[in-house]
């Protein structure tokens, strides 16, 4: 039976490159000279540092710009609130989403069940596998998922016939 997997995975090589390019631009920009503005990547978290809110916002804008240029969807970013660290410095954590959380997976599963297509959706850890008898039904399900779940950068892979 034909099937496909619905996943939500960022290309971490491109994320790393975008963070490195952001750090390079921060180092060369005149308005960041003599400030503590910086950006770091650890595991699946990007940490932004700055002296004030507007600096953090500028660093975040640079990061979003670099990610967009590298074809990484900015919907992968989960921006946290800025935190004060020693003195007048600020830190902001930006988490990179990876995988579909159980709430979103259940939403996708419910969407497919309510669509009246002859398909089954199974939640498998951080992805949703959709199985059906006809390839046309699977393509209709892909279109339906893309249309109704716009807040997640979903991709479809592992298409089996």
Swiss-Prot record:
InterPro entries from the UniProt entry: DUF520, UPF0234-like_C, UPF0234_N, YajQ-like_sf
Keyword Endoplasmic reticulum (UniProt): no
CDD domains: YajQ_like
GO MF term list: nucleotide binding
Gene Ontology cellular component list: cytosol
The keyword Nucleotide-binding belongs to this UniProt entry's keyword annotation: yes
UniProt xrefs under Pfam families: DUF520 (PF04461)
Keywords on record: Nucleotide-binding
Cross-referenced PANTHER family: UPF0234 PROTEIN YAJQ
Family the UniProt entry places it in: Belongs to the YajQ family.
Protein task: Nucleotide-binding protein.
Protein name: Nucleotide-binding protein Dtpsy_2240
